[in-house]
Amino acid sequence: MMISDLPHDLESEILSRVPAKSLAKWKTTCKRWYALFRDPSFVKKNFDKAGGREMIVLMNSRVYSNSVNLQGINNRFDPSMEVTGKLIKLNDSKGVDISAIFHCDGLILCTTTESTGLVVWNPCTGEIRCIKPRIFYRCNDRYALGYGNSKSSCHSYKILRSCCYYVDQNLSLMAAEFEIYDFSTDSWRDLGDITRDMIVYSSGVSLKGNTYWVSGSKEKGFFMRYFDFSKEVFGRLPLPYQSFNANHTAALSAVGNEKIAVLQQKILAMSDEMRIWVTNKIDEAKDLSWSNFLLTVDYGKFNLPCLVNVTSFLLDEENKVAVCSDVDTKDGLRSRIYIVGKDFYKEVFKDTRGSDNNWPLLLCYVPSLVSIQENIPNKAEENEIKGG
């Protein structure tokens, strides 16, 4: 019996367990599969069952895919990393330089270095959507990609643009701009000055459609700021450390689909210590709580030539190690990636050149079939799709 002879429900269940990258190659096999792989309920089921995660990194205005092998690390086997290729095809064809990336639901939001536009890209399907500004982009804009809850199985994807800036020479008066781009209407909406408490100390991370940052002030201390894309409002959550100190730096990272990790350093106080905490499963109906120190690293014991200032990280809870990125200030500002644990440090990658503006960013990426274009096949796909 062939899979095409199975009842459609059983066929759909079997295919939902196949990696999205393989399904993307099969989408033109027949009309039925093409329609199935674009069905929002099937796309969500396939994404929820996804086991494989990949790592991507932004370096030197380019986005690369990486492969990190941590197997056997607790048995003293050396981990390794391979830069497997450049991802963004725009880099080669149009010379587009990327200044920031943001991952949500298998989609990558790219900001160009000249602030000329936004590009939303699905690496799995190859779909690209260019977003034009409502009026213009500012060089200090921040962008986040998320989605609101919908009665249908299809997520309602949105982009948040936020910009806070001073309007006087004394730096005492601050203005703020907030806009939402809605994929379903292909348009921007002005949210007004909904908050001016938007000074953030970390890159944003997406979890369950919402975006989280580390924020803080002398009056309020450090806290976790989040934006709810369903209600289109900001909220606050506690961090495991509350006091505000300008010597502290922080980074956030999503841990699977349920938790967030925060990394803290006292880098400007010349401290070699790094601490990482992890939340419980984030649920709007429950209070947020944090683990005790999941991982505390004293970089001093590794006799490194300079202080480590982590710009981004990915946490492996099982092995209690973190894959971190930073810039080696003693070696031409070259980006480096290393794996670190309580008693373990291994550099697995160093860039061949440095740059004053080169701050590497690591992201955990999950391939997805989600479509960001109109549900109409292009001419090339129409010609490829077989009958049935």
UniProtKB/Swiss-Prot annotation:
Transmembrane regions: none
Lineage, opening ranks: Eukaryota, Viridiplantae, Streptophyta, Embryophyta, Tracheophyta
Database matches in Pfam families: F-box, FBA_1
Protein name: F-box/kelch-repeat protein At3g17530
Kelch repeat locations: 163-208, 336-383
Key word Nucleotide-binding present: no
Key word Repeat present: yes
Keywords for this protein: Kelch repeat, Repeat
NCBIfam families registered for this protein in UniProt: F_box_assoc_1 (TIGR01640)
PROSITE patterns: FBOX (PS50181)
Domain named F-box: residues: 1-50
Superkingdom of the organism of origin: Eukaryota
